[in-house]
């Protein structure tokens, strides 16, 4: 009897692992159907008790695997651009630009995961699927990310994604009007504006 129970437990574990593997493969395949796109987005940040901390909106351009332009237009403007090698963050309010090597950028943020769609990075998460909804839990619980969810249709259209941090703060993004089309290369180049300070972390 004990042997049967043990076998049953092992089989259940195998089924869970297969489900995680299938969900991960499905998510990667869906995201892989779209190489480049443009969309507008809204952002809502809430505390662990559900209180709204910040609301914002902006525009997003992506060309996988390493090119993107994330332009937050409100409540405060900020620009995050990857040209494939350097990650540029521009804050017009403080007139400062920070430059980092893209290869050094963390892969455990939802946006970087979506943009890169790298199998090695996805393997660091347990992934479950319900229809178009995917939920990801990091294998490494020591990080700041507690849970990440994304809704992506079978044709690769991202409808929304959100991240919950260990302290319960949630950042939710709703994408609207995604256009799966060619994006001009100029969107992924960054020219240092006159009069701003450059904090170059690539040294």
Curated annotation (Swiss-Prot):
Q: Which Pfam families match?
A: LolA (PF03548)
Q: Which residues form the signal peptide?
A: 1-21
* Signal recorded as keyword: yes
InterPro entries, per database record: LolA/LolB/LppX, OM_lipoprot_carrier_LolA-like, OM_lipoprot_carrier_LolA_Pbac
Similarity annotation = Belongs to the LolA family.
| Role played | Participates in the translocation of lipoproteins from the inner membrane to the outer membrane. Only forms a complex with a lipoprotein if the residue after the N-terminal Cys is not an aspartate (The Asp acts as a targeting signal to indicate that the lipoprotein should stay in the inner membrane).
Protein name in UniProt: Outer-membrane lipoprotein carrier protein
Q: Which organism is it from?
A: Photorhabdus laumondii subsp. laumondii (strain DSM 15139 / CIP 105565 / TT01) (Photorhabdus luminescens subsp. laumondii)
Q: Which gene encodes it?
A: lolA
């Amino acid at each position: 009897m004990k042997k049967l129970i043990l076998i049953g437990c092992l089989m259940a574990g195998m089924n869970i692992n297969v489900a995680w593997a299938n969900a991960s493969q499905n998510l990667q395949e869906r995201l892989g159907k779209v190489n480049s796109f443009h969309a507008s987005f809204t952002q809502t940040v809430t505390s662990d008790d559900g209180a709204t901390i910040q609301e914002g909106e902006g525009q997003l351009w992506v060309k996988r695997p390493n090119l993107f332009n994330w332009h937050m237009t409100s409540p405060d403007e900020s620009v995050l651009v990857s040209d494939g090698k350097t990650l540029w963050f521009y804050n017009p309010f403080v007139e400062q630009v920070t430059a980092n090597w893209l290869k050094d950028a963390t892969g455990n943020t939802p946006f970087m995961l979506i943009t890169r769609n790298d199998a090695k990075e996805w393997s660091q998460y347990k992934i479950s699927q319900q229809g178009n909804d995917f939920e990801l839990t990091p294998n490494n619980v020591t990080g700041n990310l507690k849970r990440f969810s994304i809704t992506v249709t079978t044709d690769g259209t991202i409808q929304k994604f959100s991240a919950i941090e260990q302290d319960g703060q949630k950042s939710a993004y709703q994408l609207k009007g995604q256009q799966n089309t060619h994006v001009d290369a100029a969107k992924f180049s960054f020219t240092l504006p006159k009069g701003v300070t450059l904090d170059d972390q690539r040294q």
